[in-house]
Amino acid sequence: MKTSFHIGDIISYLDLCNEEKTNLQKGMNYKIRDDYSIILMSLRKNAPYADRIEDDGRILIYEGHDMPKYKSLGIGFDPKSVDQPMQNKKGTMLENGKFYNSAIMHRDFEEPAEIVKVYEKIQPGIWSYNGFFDLIDSWQEDDKNRKVFKFKLSLRDQQDISKSDY
């Protein structure tokens, strides 16, 4: 899959949605395309998740997502007060669980890494294209009073991907 963007391109949200042919509303989008997944990250001050960049941008550490606010058990429910979920109450995998399982299959069983296309929010409506990454690891960390998912992604040397890469 070729992309019309180059790493570091500054784009509008509309450009992002046109490129992906969908209106992206959530940060983690597992297998949104046959040949890749998408994550939307933010390093902005006051960003809701502790995403970070290492090794001059070649490694991303992406934090998983909280329980949706609509799942609250009452007024004042704080999603940051509970562990990030892997699955819903019915046992269906949520995005955290899908990405986690894919990373573990790669790390522990040498399955091909999930290819992930990464966009970074610069400010409202303005994004940066960060390129294609391989999802190479995942784990849970203690964060104050709860557990959060962490996902390690490595920048792909090959930025033009095809199904044969997958």
Give residue spans per PLM region:
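Acidic, glycine-rich low-complexity segments with interspersed aromatic residues
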Residues: 2-128
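Compact mixed alphabeta submodule
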Residues: 122-166
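Polar low-complexity intrinsically disordered regions
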Residues: 1-2, 164
